[in-house]
Amino acid sequence: REAGIAWTNAPGCNSASVAQYVQSALLLLQQLKGVQLSELTLGIIGVGNVGSKIAQVGQELGMRVLKNDLPRQDKEGESDFSSLQALAAECDILTFHVPLYKEGSYKTFHLADHTFFRSLKRCPVIINTSRGEVIETNALLNALEDGLISDAIIDVWENEPDINLTLLNRVFLGTPHI
């Protein structure tokens, strides 16, 4: 203000673009990997502006959709949410759409760590378009190498712009934080 520069906050302004990115990635999986999306369960971690649109995309593609959003569940008390453990057990694709919180009761920093990946039951595809630090890079790379997940679609990277090139060369789709 002192410098005469105006600014504004525009939460959710890119949510449609992120939803289009995820939809395109899902369709690319279907085309190149031969998966039938309508037979899969999509788990959405973080159901705000972006996650809500992803839920709609999943439903339009005929997918079963499970949603996880602990802050919203605590605030709204909705029974429409599933636990992270339920998503780990039931989902074929897990997509992250959470803000980055390094501390607190809703901490998302390294939410997907070695323990998380070892809890997965269905060898899912992992999608991250939220914040790079939500997924621990070494844990993701180990999960790929150990067959705990079948593939990864990554648009946001831990330590951007100095990303892990081994991980970049291992993912199904890697993009530069579009």
Annotate each predicted stretch with a short phrase.
Residues Q73-L165:
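Rossmann-like adenosine-cofactor binding region
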Residues S17, K53, I135-N138:
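Residues that form or flank phosphate/diphosphate-binding pockets in enzymes
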Residues R1-V35:
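Phosphate/diphosphate ligand-binding glycine-rich loop within oxidoreductases
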Residues A25-G62:
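Glycine-rich NAD(P)-binding loop of Rossmann-like domains
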Residues V65-D69:
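Short beta-strand "acidic-cap" motif of Rossmann-like dinucleotide-binding folds
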Residues T166-I178:
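Short FAD-binding loop at a beta-strand-to-alpha-helix junction that anchors the flavin cofactor
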